[in-house]
Amino acid sequence: MGFPVVYHPDYVTPIPEEHRFPMPKFRLLHGLLLEDGVIQPEQVYQPQLPDRAWLELVHEPDYVTAYCQGTLTPKAQRRIGLPWSAGVVQRTLTAVGGTILTAQLALEHGLACNTAGGTHHAFPGYGSGFCILNDLAIATRTIQQRGLAQRILIVDLDVHQGDGTAFIFQDDPTVFTFSMHCEVNFPSQKQRSDLDLGLPEGLDDDGYLQILAHHLEDLLSQVKPDLVFYDAGVDTHVGDRLGKLAMTNTGLYRRERLVLSTCLAAGYPVACVIGGGYAKNIHDLVYRHSLLHRAARDVY
C-alpha cells in the first residue's frame, strides 16, 4: 500500500465566497489526488477531534475557550482574518487532529501527508494570518507527551516566516525550527527561529533549490530528529498573490522531492502539511498543492 494520506470532509466549511482564503482547496485536493490516481481510497485516514488538553499544551486556555465559544474581541477576530462560525471552529479543530494523526502515521510508516495544516502564524494567546491554532506546535507537543518522539525538526518552506511556531519553541531545546521564507513579506515583525533563511524577492527555482540543498542535509545530521514536520506551502510560486518569489510547478515538485528524499534516505520520518497558497485560479492552486503528494508517491 502507498503512503498514508489524512483527510476529513470537515476540512471545508462555508465562508463568504469573495473571501481570499481558498477554503474549497482541501476538498478539491483530496478529489484531484484520487482522480489522478496519485492515491487510492484505502490510503486515506480520517482524523478525530483533538483532546482539549492537547490544545492547551501550546495555547492559553482562555484563548481556546474564547475562540471556540465565539467570544473573542472583534480586534482579535480581525487579526485572524477569517469569519467566526461553529463550522470554522470544527474545521480548525479537525485540521489540528489531522496533523496529529499525520505525525503518528509518519512515525509508523516513515512518511505521511495531511491535505491541510500548516497554521504557523498562531501564537499561544492569539491567532493571526488565517491561523487560529498552531497545528504543528500542538502535534509536536502531543507526540512528545505521548512518548512517541522527543527530538523534532520543523522544516517550514511556506513563503511567510513561521513566526508563531518560532515563538512557541524559542526556549525549547527539543524542537529545532527552520524557516526559509521571503524576507520582505508578512509578518512584518519576524520572530527568531533556530535557523531563518530570509530570501530576496523574485528568487527562481534554481536559486531557491541551491540554498535549500546547501542547508538541509547538514541540518538533519546536526539535529538528528526523531520526526520531521514539513510545511510545504506553495505560496513561493511565481503566480501566487501573496508570495513575491518566482518558483514554477517544476521547481515546487523538485523542492518536495528534495525534502522528502533527503529525509527518507537518512532514515528520518516525515509528517507533511500543505501550508499556504493564494492563486487567483483555485484549480491551479490545488495542482500546486498536489505536487507534495505526487513527490511523496514517487519517493515512497
UniProtKB/Swiss-Prot annotation:
Gene Ontology MF term list: histone deacetylase activity; hydrolase activity
SUPFAM superfamilies, per database record: Arginase/deacetylase (SSF52768)
Domain of life: Bacteria
Keywords recorded for this protein, A-Z: Hydrolase
Biological process annotations from GO: epigenetic regulation of gene expression
Pfam assignment, any one: Hist_deacetyl
Protein's job: Putative deacetylase.
Family, similarity comment: Belongs to the histone deacetylase family.
The protein, known as: Uncharacterized protein SYNPCC7002_A1628
Organism: Picosynechococcus sp. (strain ATCC 27264 / PCC 7002 / PR-6)
